[in-house]
């Protein structure tokens, strides 16, 4: 009697990532489920449980797949990679497409683990590498910088509102607006028209001249004092406190962003990217784009990179009809869109 044993060449692990509880399942290359979907916590105990489940299999045959889900997946990705597992990070769009083709449009964490495994089987994948780990760290740094910039922009809007209440004429006094060094230096110390009008012309002249490196002098000081005397702003000392403290927050954020820029530029010194050769794109812009895209080599064709960045045109065609004008695709990442816009403006 002859016995035939099926040789398993690949073992797939699908992990559905969430904030507190992850789900994982294991299947062989024929689709047979070796380990049914199970939950494990996003902590040391949970990670040990995952390792215990995976220790039952030959590590050389294991391929782990999980979706790129932002901050919730980063620590698990780093843990698995540093533990020596082969790893593939999947675009969530791929699993979403597979879900649409299913007869039952069920979406649960357990079902998603099997969809991730199926995605590994039917779609091309690329193994996670040290270069990807470097780009992941870069992305974290750049996104933090982007958040600081958003906070600064929000504070600037608030500051303009406060100034418009107490000294509405001040907003148009400087051609460059209120968000300049001379304006900040003045408003931090004297944020009401009454205080500015009471200053000696020489004192105001010295303050403005020093903050503007000589750009504003006596004529500017006299004109500003005259404007302050006739201001129709509200007399509210508490808003003056808000103005001074808001400027302090803006200046702190500006210094933090400057420090982050230095850290990003230092990190880019070890990354050899063709983006650095593009005129007008500096180290920070290049780092932010690379942090979102990752290793450009993972895109086999330029059109795939364009699609990932949301720069591919949508196509409307039916029968012999083809639309003459179409919109750009809206499928892309918000963070990447922001950096694309920034690069276009350079």
Annotate the PLM regions:
Residues 1-337, 342:
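A detector of single, family-specific signature residues
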